[in-house]
Amino acid sequence: MTKRTFGGTSRKRKRVSGFRVRMRSHTGRRVVRTRRKRGRSRLTV
């Protein structure tokens, strides 16, 4: 069996789907708004 080598990179993840990136675009703001409305504890990554 081979090892699972994918670890995930936090910097990359933040750059793609962090809070500040979400606030940049209209659709990103909509995502945050929807998640607030649903009562999510984590709005973004």
UniProtKB/Swiss-Prot annotation:
GO terms (BP aspect): translation
Alphabetically ordered keywords of this record: Ribonucleoprotein, Ribosomal protein
GO cellular component: ribonucleoprotein complex; ribosome
Listed GO MF terms: structural constituent of ribosome
Region Disordered: start-end pairs: 1-45
Family: Belongs to the bacterial ribosomal protein bL34 family.
Protein name: Large ribosomal subunit protein bL34
Lineage: Bacteria, Bacillati, Cyanobacteriota, Cyanophyceae, Synechococcales
